[in-house]
């Protein structure tokens, strides 16, 4: 989520620190509260070991998606059909399935709209009057019961049904006439859907008007499986705007049909470049794949040129695939400048850093450096923690402050210099938390925002010889504020935090704690070994806070 939120709350934080630092309060330190034997509320289990590793019987369900979608750039309407292949690897038969319908946040009668304060919020649609939310059409199921896993699967029988379902706010419950088998039961869920995009979609998606056309940044745009796990069973907390996401991993095949004058970028790799790019653009992309410097794929002077788009059809379908992902987002516009460079990964593999942005953002102190920032960020985290897994890392200018998705991020078209570096680096840091290490953001915001803010501090120190290196802070001055008992605990779910406190409690305070642990308690070597082991253990899995704490204690 946006680093702008962190910066704004940090400014308030400094003001508060100035006030509280004038007096020295008596320490409230209590050894028994901090280190008592009751810290861990349960012992290790078959699915999660006491040492912080996934247990010998750890299981996780999966969800693959095939989605065909079209964009009407005049009405801002998205129309699609999807097939979700859901595999139940749990030891439980499932009598029903839960689906997330995040666009329903923008219905007039949604729970999220009901709790937006009268003085405004970054959540919701900022008062836009429109017909928001999903329209759900046909829903059907095809499922195959495989039963318990064996070395050789027996022949399975497929059954097609039209299920009963009910929609409550941002959730959809599909009732199964026949339970989905445990330990490998598979079902295909087919859903037709459409929605009208908000202009401002809770600072996570939306539509930006530019002089050369609209930029459509599409996220939370398709019905998505809820997670069924060994902690809570079905995770069905509603989407209210502040709490982010918890999703299953899988493979996504996405076909996006748009007007031919649009360029499209999406999570993953493009499968049909010859059908959607000109010969010149294909050649420029080949050059970029070999270049450590930014190469222009489509320049500012080509944005309105018919020669910069294929001429054969009125509409084009762009086909993308991403594997080992928990989500997918995309962007489409006729207004894009497009540039790229290669990313060098520790294994010797290559990926592509790409940026798309309007002419309004095209200057050397702004988005002309976006690909440079993207490349540096991905290369740093890949070298320091674990290798970037996707074929491209794409930065898109939009009307979002900053928002992250697998392989693609949306950042403010107004950002420049240090601000653009900061938001770009922050959003791409989220590839590691929570895109690779898939924690439950809706419950534990600090496990992605706090961890990410921490690794951002190291990448910023390293970038370009310290070009934007932050000054060292006096933690003694901050201590009174960090233990302010008028603020909620860090572990409070984000939907239950005061909005003004989210930046401190989810971002800064956990980051400060990790920095102190690394710099002053464990030391860099011991901390880095344990933190890297946590990433390796829980890549593409669903860790809880206890899994993190146990790993850090056992490894360090």
Q: Model segments located where?
A:
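Ligand-binding face of N-terminal immunoglobulin V-set domains in extracellular IgSF glycoproteins
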Residues: 76-105, 109-112
């Amino acid at each position: 989520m946006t680093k702008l939120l962190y910066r704004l709350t940090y400014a308030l934080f400094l003001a508060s620190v100035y006030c509280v630092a004038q007096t020295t309060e008596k320490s409230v330190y209590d050894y028994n509260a901090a280190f008592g034997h009751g810290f861990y509320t349960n012992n290790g289990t078959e699915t999660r070991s006491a040492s912080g590793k996934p247990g010998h019987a750890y299981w996780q369900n999966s969800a693959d998606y095939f989605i065909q979608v079209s964009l009407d750039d005049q009405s801002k309407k998205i129309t699609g059909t999807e097939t979700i292949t859901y595999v139940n690897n749990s030891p439980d038969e499932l009598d029903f399935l839960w689906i997330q319908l995040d666009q329903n946040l923008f219905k007039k009668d949604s729970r999220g709209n009901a709790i937006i304060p009268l003085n405004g919020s970054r959540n919701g649609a900022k008062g836009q009057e429109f017909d928001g939310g999903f329209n759900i059409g046909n829903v059907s199921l095809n499922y195959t019961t495989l039963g318990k896993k064996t070395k050789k699967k027996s022949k399975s029988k497929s059954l097609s049904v039209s299920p009963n379902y009910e929609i409550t706010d941002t959730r959809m419950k599909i009732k199964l006439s026949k339970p989905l088998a445990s330990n490998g039961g598979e079902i295909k869920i087919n859903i037709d859907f459409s929605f009208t995009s908000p202009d401002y979609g809770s600072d996570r998606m939306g539509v930006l008007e530019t002089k050369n056309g609209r930029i459509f940044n599409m996220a939370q745009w398709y019905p998505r499986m809820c997670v069924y796990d060994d902690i809570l069973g079905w995770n069905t907390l509603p989407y209210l705007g502040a709490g982010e996401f918890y999703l299953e991993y899988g493979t996504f095949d996405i076909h996006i049909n748009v007007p031919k004058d649009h360029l499209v970028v999406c999570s993953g790799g493009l499968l049909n470049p010859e059908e959607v790019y000109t010969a010149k653009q294909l050649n420029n992309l080949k050059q970029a794949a070999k270049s450590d410097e930014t190469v222009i794929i489509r320049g500012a002077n080509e944005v309105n040129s018919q020669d910069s788009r294929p001429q054969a059809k009125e509409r084009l379908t762009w086909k993308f695939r991403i594997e080992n992902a928990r989500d997918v987002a995309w962007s489409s516009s006729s207004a894009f400048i497009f540039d790229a460079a290669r990313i060098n990964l520790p294994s010797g593999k290559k990926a592509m850093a790409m940026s798309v942005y309007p002419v309004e953002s095209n200057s050397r102190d702004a988005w002309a450096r976006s690909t440079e920032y993207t490349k540096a960020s991905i290369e740093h985290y890949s070298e320091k923690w674990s290798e970037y897994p996707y074929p491209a890392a794409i930065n898109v200018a939009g009307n979002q402050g900053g928002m992250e998705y697998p392989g693609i991020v949306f950042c403010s078209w107004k950002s420049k210099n240090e601000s653009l570096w900061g938001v770009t680096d922050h959003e791409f840091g989220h590839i590691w938390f929570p895109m690779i290490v898939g924690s439950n953001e809706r419950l534990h915001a600090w496990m992605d925002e706090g961890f990410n803010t921490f690794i951002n501090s190291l990448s910023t120190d390293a970038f370009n010889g310290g070009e934007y290196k932050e000054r060292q802070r006096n933690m003694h001055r901050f201590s009174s504020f960090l233990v302010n008992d008028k603020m909620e605990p860090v572990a409070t779910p984000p939907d239950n935090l005061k909005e003004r406190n989210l930046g401190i409690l989810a971002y800064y305070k956990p980051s400060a704690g990790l920095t102190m642990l690394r710099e002053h308690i464990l030391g860099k070597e011991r901390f880095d070994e344990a933190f890297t082991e946590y990433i390796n253990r829980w890549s593409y899995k669903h860790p809880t806070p206890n899994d993190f704490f146990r790993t850090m204690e056992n490894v360090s």
